[in-house]
């Protein structure tokens, strides 16, 4: 019912383009959304101070894990530590609900390992994790948290993949640091030890940042959710068809497709029905916590008079087998192809209106979605 969307505002920043972007979004969208600004240059850094009061945007992403070929592919640059710390201080000065988000991977070590592995002729699916090993993520997580601590800046770390990440979050919470951890369905269910067939057949599909890890990381991340160390679940959706992925893992666009639509079935089937977490925990990490973290509560993530009446009705006994042919995405493959999930949404309700029933969108004209400003404007 409501998406958190990262905005890559190239050239002129977001403020000059905001009215145009908002108009286009609200003309085409079927659901609501709030936006995060990707801080990629001097312009977007300056805009941090203006976004909350001018456009109701209070979350800002720093790309510590991107430079080189993949950054060039999507038109972004890495944020060095000085620029990151400067941005953190600016966000701290804004006050709640403003928050920084960081993609945490040590990109310099990745690029060094990448060159070594390419020289060896490696192009199998396992090579992606080897080029971005767990310590690369752990080191950058610790660095981002340390910078945020010294700037007194709230920090959101998306798509955590590593077992050590749970320990890092526990240490930060013990030290009283305001850091929120997020993981994604794919990192709870998939790994390089039991690879999805599509990754073996088409290694370029394994190009996702951070990479899929190992079985022990899968279970430690579930533990992190149970212990409220990981407080949010995201999709990190980045769809690409097999043709777009191509034949080279080193040149493929990043991301795994068909994740958003399966986020809730994963949490219900692999989480609730297998006894890993409670249904209440699913509500907490998928709705209540994200709404509070990003300043859209109590309008979203909440059921009470005055809230938006965004509701999902689920059937914990409903069993279906996943196929890319029945999913609603441009992506023609899925790491979940053939998985049988028990626990599916049966009604999705946006602002009191049923918009999806038994997995099929109801006929509606586009333009039903709204941009959701944060509470700073109210």
Name what the model sees in each region.
Residues 43-233:
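Histidine/acidic residue-rich metal-binding segments in metalloenzymes
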Residues 24-39:
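A glycine-rich helix N-cap at a beta->alpha junction
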Residues 7-12, 37-43, 66, 288-290:
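Acidic, glycine-rich active-site loops and adjacent beta-strand->loop/helix elements
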Residues 123-152, 205-206, 224-233, 238-318:
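His/Asp/Glu-enriched, well-ordered alpha-helical/loop segment
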Residues 1-28:
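Metal-associated gating/positioning segment near the N- to mid-region
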Residues 249, 305-371:
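C-terminal cap of metal-dependent C-N hydrolases
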Residues 16-26, 113-130, 154, 161-181, ...:
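Short, electropositive alpha-helical surface patch
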Residues 2-5, 34-37, 154-159:
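Short catalytic-loop micro-motif centered on adjacent basic/acidic residues
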């Amino acid at each position: 019912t409501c998406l958190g969307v990262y905005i890559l505002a190239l050239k002129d920043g977001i403020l000059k383009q905001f009215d145009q972007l908002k108009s286009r979004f609200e003309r085409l969208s079927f659901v609501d959304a709030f936006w995060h600004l990707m801080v990629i240059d001097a312009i977007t850094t300056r805009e941090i101070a203006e976004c909350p009061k001018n456009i109701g945007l209070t979350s800002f992403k720093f790309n510590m894990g991107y430079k080189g070929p993949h950054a060039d592919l999507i038109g972004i640059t890495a944020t060095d530590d000085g620029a990151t710390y400067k941005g953190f201080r600016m966000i701290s000065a804004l006050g709640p609900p403003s928050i920084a988000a960081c993609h945490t991977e040590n990109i310099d070590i990745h690029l060094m390992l990448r060159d070594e592995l390419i020289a060896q002729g490696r192009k199998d699916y396992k090579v992606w994790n080897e080029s971005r090993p767990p310590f690369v993520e752990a080191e950058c997580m610790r660095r981002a948290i340390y910078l945020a601590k010294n700037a007194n800046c709230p920090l959101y770390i998306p798509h955590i993949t590593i077992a050590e990440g749970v320990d890092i979050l526990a240490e930060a919470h013990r030290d009283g640091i305001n850091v929120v951890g997020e993981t994604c369905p794919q990192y709870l269910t998939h790994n390089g030890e039991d690879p999805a067939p599509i990754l073996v057949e088409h290694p370029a599909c394994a190009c996702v940042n951070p990479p899929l890890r190992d079985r022990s990381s899968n279970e430690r991340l579930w533990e992190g959710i149970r212990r409220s160390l990981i407080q949010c679940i995201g999709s990190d959706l980045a769809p690409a068809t097999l043709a777009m992925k191509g034949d080279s893992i080193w040149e493929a666009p990043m991301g795994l497709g068909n994740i958003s639509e399966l986020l809730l079935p994963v949490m219900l089937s692999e989480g609730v029905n297998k006894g890993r977490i409670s249904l209440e925990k699913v509500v907490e990490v998928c709705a209540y916590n994200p709404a509070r973290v990003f300043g859209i509560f109590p309008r979203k993530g909440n059921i009470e008079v005055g809230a938006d009446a965004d509701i999902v009705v689920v059937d914990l006994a409903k069993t279906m087998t996943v196929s890319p042919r029945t999913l609603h995405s441009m992506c023609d493959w899925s790491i979940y192809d053939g998985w049988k999930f028990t626990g599916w949404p049966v009604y999705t309700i946006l602002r009191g209106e049923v918009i999806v029933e038994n997995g099929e969108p109801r006929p509606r004209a586009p333009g039903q979605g709204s941009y959701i400003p944060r509470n700073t404007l109210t």
